[in-house]
């Protein structure tokens, strides 16, 4: 967290460039790891943003786009996992949801490209296929298992 170069080193395996967007997250807005990484991402031509809870902090000056959630002081001083962390997570959820919609991974209000990694998600996917196609649960489940994804199951009947 204190090493200004380590953030960029950690990003090297992703070959950051002009096609990328990098969002730095720092409750205080001054974390050297985040600030340094964003500076180097700017140099590489990436679009940069930040999410912080401290207006006018170093990270807001480095990022091309800043989101500042002014939540006030933490109830327990220094415990940024409380208000700051919660606010930042909500913002990240909004950003990731918007990205998934823009990428076409949502049909209507359903995430059709979800990973079917457990029984609960398989059931959810089956119900999506069932409702969208107007077929019985068992038929939808068979389609889902055959095609391996909600999107492919839906497209198989389009």
Predicted regions and their residues:
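Short, amphipathic alpha-helical interaction segments embedded in low-complexity terminal/linker regions
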Residues: 99-158
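Glycine-rich phosphate-binding loops that contact phosphosugars or nucleotide phosphates
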Residues: 1-90, 99-103
